[in-house]
């Protein structure tokens, strides 16, 4: 037990000793660490102080360098400004010297001008005195006062100016007219050359071929009931005469005549001809003709490039295929007018769209004018207005025969194109005998005047050129003769459109060099 206690005491003593030793070692280590930290801090402080001194020296040096640089820049700028000021001073000094010289020169010129002015004034006084003396002498010699002489001179000058002005105006008007006529001829010629429309002249009758003459009896029917049915349903006269294998359809309305023709051809092809069958075929023919009318109208708009027409206007346009004017097919005529108006508009630098549209529709009134009273131009204008055509188009349609005043260049172009298409030789039919007689009568009227050497009726009788003897008829007589011939033509002849009377007087001077 005692040994155990001793061992415990020994262990406790050892633990205490070890603890004390450990504490001593730790304290010594802490003191060493603190001493080292103090040394490090002192060293850092010294380093910081040295670095601060270094930075201070560097900053001081940089500040001195910057101050030196700024002082140098300032000195440089000061020198430059001083030089600029000196340069400006020299320049101002030069300007002052120049101004002084100019002032001296101006003074000299002013003195010279004053001297010249005095000299001129003296001369003017002398001239006025001489003028006064001369005027008094002239008044004494002429017996006129200065005011009277002045008025007389002004009147003479006015007369001369008026005469020269009249001559100049006449020359300008003549030149303008010649140039305008030349340009108009070029435009019209170009338009006609580009337009080559085929015209088919139609009459008021159709001839329908028959397979044999026995068919005539079947068409007539028992007691004429078949022929009466055809005439009643179509409104067209059937003429059955001795013409072999043919019957003639005669009617004023070309659409009805076409319906009768189509119906009769169908009946002949079918072979069954009786009133009920006739009625059936007439109805089919009406539908077929109506379809053809619509197709013709659409084809016309396609050919001319006119789009956006109301369907009713297109139908009326197609009806014109079955209308003629002096033998000229109205639809073909309308297409030609559309082309001509478009070509002329393009030549004049105008958009041809409206001119072509108005030209195509200009005779649309002929498709309905047998149903409505009034001139076809005004009827066409009303119809086009009803179907919402532009006022420009409506006016061009109404004005193409002068029933209303044209309000646009397109309207005038449509008038011109209509006249060109109608006046073109061969476009409208006229009996040969009446044509020749009219030309002979024209030349006969011209040749009846004294002094006429020869005359020629040209351009299908629309112009007559008369060559007169210059020794018998003078210029004034030529004008009087032209008026007299025009009056006789108007009194003695009937003619479409107008006739131009052209009296030509030519004087030639011929000499021979020997």
Curated annotation (Swiss-Prot):
PROSITE patterns: HD, KH_TYPE_1. It comes from the Bacteria. The keyword Nuclease applies. Residues 330-423 form the HD domain. Endoribonuclease that initiates mRNA decay. SMART domains: HDc, KH. It is found in: Cell membrane. Signal peptide: none annotated. Its EC number is 3.1.-.-. It comes from Clostridium acetobutylicum (strain ATCC 824 / DSM 792 / JCM 1419 / IAM 19013 / LMG 5710 / NBRC 13948 / NRRL B-527 / VKM B-1787 / 2291 / W). One of its GO terms (biological process) is mRNA catabolic process. This is Ribonuclease Y. The keyword Oxidoreductase does not apply. PANTHER family: RIBONUCLEASE Y (PTHR12826:SF15). Keywords: Cell membrane, Endonuclease, Hydrolase, Membrane, Nuclease, RNA-binding, Transmembrane, Transmembrane helix. Belongs to the RNase Y family. Residues 50-82, 99-119 are annotated as: Disordered. Residues 204-289 form the KH domain. Its main location: membrane. The gene is rny. The chain crosses the membrane at residues 5-25. One of its GO terms (cellular component) is plasma membrane. One of its GO terms (molecular function) is RNA binding. It is an enzyme of class 3 (hydrolase).
